[in-house]
UniProtKB/Swiss-Prot annotation:
HAMAP family: UPF0145 (MF_00338)
Organism: Enterobacter sp. (strain 638)
Pfam families, per the entry: YbjQ_1
Protein's recorded name: UPF0145 protein Ent638_1382
InterPro entries to which the protein is assigned, alphabetical: UPF0145_dom_sf (IPR035439), UPF0145_YbjQ-like (IPR002765)
NCBIfam families cross-referenced by the UniProt entry: PRK02877.1
S-S pairs: none
Length: 107
């Protein structure tokens, strides 16, 4: 499965548009990790814990996106948009959502 943020794939003509596909992942934030991430942010370092959670959520969302596309018989997803939002009480959770158009290409 190929993923692209562009509307086309160079050298691979799109022969069929299969439909819009999406993937979402919502992960809760840990209060202790939040506390230490806040301290690290104060002293100017990067928050490895948050970066790891973002990466994990993005991987889950893309896996869902690919599974939906495959179920439609597609071999690629183009025009992908990636969004990040905080949700829940006191913005205690992180949501990553991805969407795009599932397509069949001529290879």
């Amino acid at each position: 499965m190929q993923f692209s943020t562009t509307p086309t794939l160079e050298g691979q003509p799109i022969v069929e548009y299969c439909g819009v596909v999406t993937g979402e992942a919502i992960l809760g934030a840990n209060i202790f990790r939040d506390f230490f991430a806040g301290i690290r942010d104060i002293v100017g370092g990067r928050s490895g814990a948050y970066e790891k959670e973002l990466r994990k959520a993005r991987e889950i969302a893309f896996k869902e996106l690919g599974e939906q596309a495959k179920a439609l018989g597609a071999d690629a997803v183009v025009g992908i948009d990636i969004d990040y939002e905080t949700v829940g009480k006191d913005a205690s959770m992180l949501m990553v959502s991805v969407s795009g158009t599932a397509v069949k290409t001529r290879r």
